[in-house]
């Protein structure tokens, strides 16, 4: 599996509870926080839910 770097670029304030939980599951919480994750189908699904809040790079 490929590793991707996920960076949160938009605040979670005034976002739905589901989107906040997805960000927490990814290991994000504050603006400009970054994590590296394996690109599994479950991570892809989470990224689809919060694609307007994060930037994904290879």
From Swiss-Prot:
Subunit field text: Part of the 50S ribosomal subunit.
Q: Which CDD domains match?
A: Ribosomal_L30
Family under the similarity heading:
Belongs to the universal ribosomal protein uL30 family.
PROSITE patterns attached here? RIBOSOMAL_L30
| Listed GO MF terms | structural constituent of ribosome
* Protein name as catalogued: Large ribosomal subunit protein uL30
* GO CC terms of this entry: cytosolic large ribosomal subunit
Alphabetical list of HAMAP family matching this protein: Ribosomal_uL30_B (MF_01371_B)
Instruction: Please give the organism.
Output: Cytophaga hutchinsonii (strain ATCC 33406 / DSM 1761 / CIP 103989 / NBRC 15051 / NCIMB 9469 / D465)
Gene symbol here is rpmD
State whether keyword RNA-binding applies.
Answer: no
Biological processes annotated in GO: translation
Q: Which UniProt keywords apply?
A: Ribonucleoprotein, Ribosomal protein
């Amino acid at each position: 599996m490929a590793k991707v770097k996920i960076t949160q670029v938009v605040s979670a304030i005034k976002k739905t509870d589901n989107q906040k939980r997805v960000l927490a599951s990814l290991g994000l919480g504050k603006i400009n926080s970054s994590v590296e994750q394996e690109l599994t189908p479950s991570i892809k699904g989470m990224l689809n839910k919060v694609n307007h809040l994060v930037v994904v790079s290879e």
